[in-house]
Amino acid sequence: MLGKILLLNGPNLNMLGKREPDIYGHDTLEDVVALATAEAAKHGLEVEALQSNHEGELIDALHNARGTHIGCVINPGGLTHTSVALLDAVKASELPTVEVHISNPHAREEFRHHSYISLAAVSVIAGAGIQGYRFAVDILANLKK
């Protein structure tokens, strides 16, 4: 393998397929990981996936990926709109990072319109369903070339 991508999913994303399927669809977190892993394999890359409902675990994963991964795909969930600490961890990781949202936050409640993470992201993908993860992996693979 030519490198590893860190795939991070934040709070409540373990509930994909069950929580608000009218917004997030019926695909599960396992479907997301399988899709990202398959796309990465096409580029000779691996995926290391972590979902956590705890901000500190996501921060630790970013710190640990510094210098060992080629990039990060992150769906921070609700932390998108609140976490300066997660933004700082993305910056500290020095990884090219693609922010993904299954739904389009800009078409939802006002408080979802601001993203701290996007300040450090090389790209933001929103509203493409779980296909956004595939697009994100492809972006990172092409940045690596």
Swiss-Prot record:
This is 3-dehydroquinate dehydratase. Catalyzes a trans-dehydration via an enolate intermediate. Homododecamer. The active site is at 24 (proton acceptor), 101 (proton donor). The keyword Lyase applies. GO terms for molecular function: 3-dehydroquinate dehydratase activity. Pathway: Metabolic intermediate biosynthesis; chorismate biosynthesis; chorismate from D-erythrose 4-phosphate and phosphoenolpyruvate: step 3/7. Its EC number is 4.2.1.10. Pfam families: DHquinase_II (PF01220). It is an enzyme of class 4 (lyase). The gene is aroQ. It catalyses: 3-dehydroquinate = 3-dehydroshikimate + H2O. Keywords: Amino-acid biosynthesis, Aromatic amino acid biosynthesis, Lyase. SUPFAM superfamilies: Type II 3-dehydroquinate dehydratase. It comes from Corynebacterium glutamicum (strain R). Belongs to the type-II 3-dehydroquinase family. Substrate binds at residues 75, 81, 88, 102-103, 112. It comes from the Bacteria. InterPro entries: DHquinase_II, DHquinase_II_CS, DHquinase_II_sf. The record marks 19 as: Transition state stabilizer. GO terms for biological process: amino acid biosynthetic process; aromatic amino acid family biosynthetic process; chorismate biosynthetic process; quinate catabolic process. The keyword Amino-acid biosynthesis applies. HAMAP family: AroQ.
